[in-house]
Amino acid sequence: MEGNPHSIIEGMLIAAVAAGSDEGYIYVRAEYPLAVSRLKTAIAKAEEMGLLGDNILGTDFCFHLHVNRGAGAFVCGEGSALTASIEGNRGMPRVKPPRTVEQGLWARPTVLNNVETFSNVPLIIRRGSAWYRSIGTERSHGTKAFALTGNVVNTGLIEVPMGTTLRQIIFEIGGGIKDGKKFKAVQIGGPSTEEHLDMPLDFDSLKKVGAMIGSGGLVVMDEDTCMVEVARFFMNFTQNESCGKCVPCREGTRRMLEILTRIVNNEGSLEDLDLLEDLSSTITETALCGLGQSACKPVQSTLKYFRDEYLAHVVEKHCPHCNGRKKELHIDPELCKGCGKCMRQCPMEAISGQIRMPHVIDTEKCIKCGACWGCCPFGAIREE
């Protein structure tokens, strides 16, 4: 959206011709002002050249494209919640069927895709499907953009062919683990361990181990990371982002967060582990949308691969990685863009700063809930 917005516009135009659409919307989080600005500029230029609007290039084909800024709710990544938000309603998923292709925006059939998908369309049209299928694996074609963050030397946005292994991404592109420490896990849907380093990143391989590509986030963790705290952190994020419409997600994630918090504070019991597993299965099977259905993956995978760390908390009442303590949170001034998202999310008003200037966390007020860490789009929140 920031680097080549014209490719998205071209892809949506091609899709509009194929589907017979005359209206299009690009839904962007308000926290990405540069993307919004460049998309609007690109749309205006396309309209000036007669590539958007009425009677495009002298034909009867008309297509109007709009940029819609979202309020930042994570659940609006779900199709029906996204369309509800564009319509001016609260972003909440609905029961399916009907699906968006049958009854989407304003009850009309709606083609809904990620901007990454639309940007690939012009290249496929120009070079052919055989060219596109030659990249990636037999069943997962093309490339994928990932946000590589965490305890790795080189962080940032990367684009790799589907089927690239985690080892290649972390150690060749990412430069390995910071400070010469050992690799422990990487979060992709759920934490994947050292035994998964040579696993290709494609849809089938990830599905087999209970992970998923999702939004393309890769969070690398080193040997000092407490995996129980990781599970608690991601559950806290999901619970905060739950729209509250369905009981399994609204109440289930809250109960799981309470249990995980007890365990991290060395106040849990062995029965809590069984309860976590039962709740995980129930929420996954009964939640209304993908947010709730995937909410328990970090808990399920950490219980499977790092159960010894849960036992250290509940049996020995001592964690070798965090000793029951939570580290202090700080904002990296070099990464912070001053978007203000963390200030709005902080329940204790512990974050201050001017818009477009680095923000600061007041460690005296901070309760280390992780809300800022979960919402920061730039990965600027650090634990020390």
Residue ranges and their predicted role:
Residues 1, 23-24, 28, 32, ...:
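Ferredoxin-type iron-sulfur electron-transfer modules in oxidoreductases and energy-metabolism complexes
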Residues 4-18:
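Histidine-anchored nucleotide/phosphate-binding helix
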Residues 11-15, 161-178:
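Short amphipathic, charge-patterned alpha-helical segments
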Residues 24, 175-190:
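Short loop-to-beta-strand transition segments
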Residues 36-162:
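Hydrophobic alpha-helical positions that pack around
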Residues 140-154, 160-162, 166, 320-367, ...:
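C-terminal accessory/binding modules appended to enzymatic or scaffolding proteins
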Residues 367, 371, 375, 379-384:
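Structured functional modules or segments
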